């Protein structure tokens, strides 16, 4: 099988450039839908939950497999508009606040307007706060967004149309290096989405069918633990494709190989698979 790496790379970058924190994934799902249409896939539906499930007829209809990848990412939601015109946010998905300190962010309003800002500690300057700035724990309560607008009060912010509940996405810093490495946020799991699309493209380009009937599930709530929570009734086998942690303290994984996960924090996986 010849893998179209250029296609995978291009589609990965396209999808990474579409902000899709959990709960704000409609644009990413719409992109996937259009990509599938371009690949000749007509049999698909968008669930009430906002995920997309495609169906590809295979050589054997007596056995049905499903593969999945997720379009949702980590992000944040506006929790509070402060009196000083700054925003307190709550995390969406699990991440360390220190990993996004100083990050450029985009605030997505209900009216589809966007505003840029910076996520910083409430006491950011060492020149002003000394060791307090260095040693203060980075938590939801000690981090805030400074909006890139002339706002001094909560009323100023409200006039922009920014409200509690607005979604916040982080800058991705996507870089394609000459040696083949990719540096970016949200390779988990948008790279895997692109890989699945490349497999469908391979089938189309070579006029092939998968060995069995195939469901392809693009989920949108994986980062908070219920990405693929419902399966088609006739499903026999399910494989989730994800960017996992293979280089932990006690792991013997390899970042350049596929890993088959035996167990996560919730449950062991199926031995026969």
Identify the function of each model-found stretch:
Residues 1-273:
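N-terminal hydrophobic/helix-forming segments and targeting peptides
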């Amino acid at each position: 099988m010849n893998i179209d790496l250029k296609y995978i790379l291009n589609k990965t970058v396209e999808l990474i450039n579409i902000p899709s924190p959990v709960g704000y994934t409609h644009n990413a799902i719409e992109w996937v839908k259009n990509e599938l249409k371009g690949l000749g896939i007509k049999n698909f539906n968008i669930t009430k939950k906002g995920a997309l499930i495609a169906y590809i007829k295979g050589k054997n209809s007596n056995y049905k497999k499903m593969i999945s990848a997720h379009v949702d990412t980590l992000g944040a939601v506006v929790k509070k508009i402060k009196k000083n015109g700054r925003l307190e946010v709550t995390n969406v998905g699990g991440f360390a606040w220190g990993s996004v300190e100083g990050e450029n962010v985009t605030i997505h309003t209900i009216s589809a307007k966007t505003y840029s800002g910076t996520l910083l500690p409430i006491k950011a300057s060492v020149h002003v706060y000394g060791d307090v700035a260095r040693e203060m724990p980075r938590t939801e309560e000690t981090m805030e967004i400074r909006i890139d607008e002339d706002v001094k009060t909560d009323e100023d912010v409200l006039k922009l149309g920014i409200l509690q509940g607005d979604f916040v996405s982080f800058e991705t810093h996507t870089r394609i290096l000459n040696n083949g490495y990719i540096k970016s946020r949200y390779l988990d799991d948008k790279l895997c989405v692109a890989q699945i699309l490349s497999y469908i493209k391979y089938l189309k380009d070579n006029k092939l069918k998968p060995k069995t009937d195939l469901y392809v599930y693009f989920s949108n709530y994986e980062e908070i633990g219920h990405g693929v929570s419902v399966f088609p009734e006739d499903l026999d086998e399910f494989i989730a494709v994800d960017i996992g942690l293979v280089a932990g303290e006690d792991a013997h994984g390899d970042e350049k190989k596929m890993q088959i996960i035996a167990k996560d924090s919730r449950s062991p996986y199926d031995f026969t698979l």
